[in-house]
Regions:
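Acidic/His- and Gly-rich active-site-bordering loop/insert found
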Residues: 1-77, 95
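Zn-dependent metallopeptidase/amidohydrolase metal-coordination segment
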Residues: 1-10, 67-68, 335-386, 391-394
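Active-site-adjacent substrate-binding region
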Residues: 6, 10, 146-195, 233-238, ...
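A short beta-alpha structural unit
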Residues: 19-20, 250-259, 271-273, 277, ...
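Flexible, glycine/charged-enriched surface loops at secondary-structure junctions
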Residues: 43-45, 101-105, 161-164, 216, ...
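Alpha-helical metal-binding/catalytic segments enriched in His/Glu/Asp
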Residues: 66, 75-115, 201-207, 213-239, ...
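Midchain, well-structured core segments that form catalytic/ion-binding scaffolds
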Residues: 113-114, 120-279
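His/Asp/Glu-rich mid-to-C-terminal helical/loop segments that flank catalytic regions of hydrolases
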Residues: 213, 220-242, 288-291, 361-399
Length: 399
């Protein structure tokens, strides 16, 4: 973990390793070397997803896939994603060290661009692999500088030859991830047994008003796009409390034009996002925010439009995988709790391919997506041990 954290390290102990950047190439090269050293058969698909395979005793048995991602948020933490990939690698090393054979092959994976920071959407590599996104459409995506995804993938040398699709049926997919929330720590638990992932909806609203001088223009003459935006943003904060304990709402982006201290804003675009374990609750939150936008536009005399940017239904993990993780935690003597993930992960897409499960490691103070993200080594070990035992159980090996 410390070694991988040096690649893209920030001055404040975090990680800046965006997808398809030079730092991403460096960590991919490092990970490929680690897999080869561990005796794995390595392959890279046409979207840059990296796989390493350890053979099982039954050549016809479906593989168990374990992994996460190595890209990071801008100035993010060293555990997000990387802990899951390193734990998968350590699983292989432990099996090798103890000469443990499994009936099913075990594969480990580093998914391309889980974070969605440089190229959107998030969970891009697993989404293409699982058939949720079109390959050519995702190849054409650009970042803020106009760099094209496919060009950047080729530039770093990770546009592989394998098709970006499952080459065979899979027995199961397991993913270890830091919780990125406070619930495990608040409840003094060692690990989290994840039962599913919240659904979410993201969108953007744009109000169109009229720019004017901020001094001579009377208040009743104004068509202020930012006033309407502020009204709706305040409702995005309030709506979740009326819907459920696990409902959350966020405005993470706002752009005002002409963005001058002396001009009434004529155009404002901002985003909204809601998450909840219930798809019905998510849709109700979306309906309410659009209703609030319509009212705000009428009050201020504005035109407005909205864009649905991304939706993902809530995911319920397979009982067999949840039970395997729960049994592993119990057998190891860890105090665990079953928990719904409040964030999206590659497991969201893998759910459509095969039985899927997740393990959460404790996040100190619930912090993530920033440089202060922290999980103790004891908590890393607990989560890694749990997913290792669960994977071996599903793969038909002795723990």
């Amino acid at each position: 973990m410390k070694e991988q954290a040096e690649i893209g390290a920030t001055d404040d102990g975090g990680l800046h390793r965006l997808a398809l950047s030079d730092e991403d190439k460096e960590i991919r090269d490092w990970f490929a070397d680690q897999m080869i050293t561990a005796g794995l058969t390595v392959r890279v698909d046409e979207f840059g997803n990296m796989f390493g395979r350890r053979a099982g005793t039954d050549p016809d048995a479906k593989p168990v896939l374990v992994g996460s991602h190595l890209d990071s948020q801008p100035y993010g933490g060293i555990y997000d994603g990387a802990l899951g990939v390193i734990a998968a690698l350590e699983l292989i090393r432990t099996l090798n060290d103890n000469e443990i054979e499994t009936t099913h092959p075990i594969e480990i994976v580093n998914w391309t661009n889980e974070e969605g920071s440089r190229f959107q959407p998030a969970m891009q590599g697993s989404g293409v692999w699982a058939g949720a996104h079109d390959l050519e459409e995702e190849y054409a995506k650009t970042d803020v500088d106009g760099d094209v995804f496919e060009d950047e993938l080729e530039r770093i040398g990770y546009k592989g030859e394998e098709p970006c699709e499952p080459p065979e049926e899979y027995e199961a997919y397991l993913e270890l991830h830091v919780e990125q929330g406070p619930y495990l720590e608040e409840n003094e638990k060692d690990v989290g047994v994840v039962t599913g992932i919240v659904g979410f909806t993201w969108g953007a609203i744009t109000f169109y008003g009229e720019a004017d001088h901020s001094g001579p223009t009377p208040m009743h003459y104004r068509q202020d796009a930012l006033v309407a935006a502020a009204d709706v943003i305040s409702q995005i904060r309030r709506i979740p409390s009326t819907l459920g304990e696990r409902t959350v709402g966020t405005t993470g982006y706002i752009d005002a034009k002409p963005n001058s201290i002396n001009i009434i804003p004529e155009e404002v675009t901002f985003t909204w996002g809601f998450r909840d374990p219930s798809d019905d609750v998510i849709e109700e939150a979306r309906r309410r925010v659009l209703e609030e936008a319509e009212w705000a536009a009428e009050r201020e005399g504005l035109e407005w439009e909205y864009e649905d940017r991304m939706r993902a239904p809530a995911v319920q993990f397979a009982d067999g995988c949840v039970d395997a993780v729960q049994t592993a935690a119990d057998d190891l003597g860890y105090d665990s709790m079953q928990i719904f993930s409040g964030a999206g992960h590659d497991a969201t897409h893998m759910h459509s391919i095969c039985d899927t499960g997740m393990v959460f490691a404790v996040s100190e103070n619930g912090k993530s997506h920033n440089e202060s993200e922290y999980t103790s080594w004891d908590d890393c070990y607990a989560a890694a041990s749990t997913i290792a035992n669960a994977a071996v159980d599903l793969a038909g090996g002795a723990k």
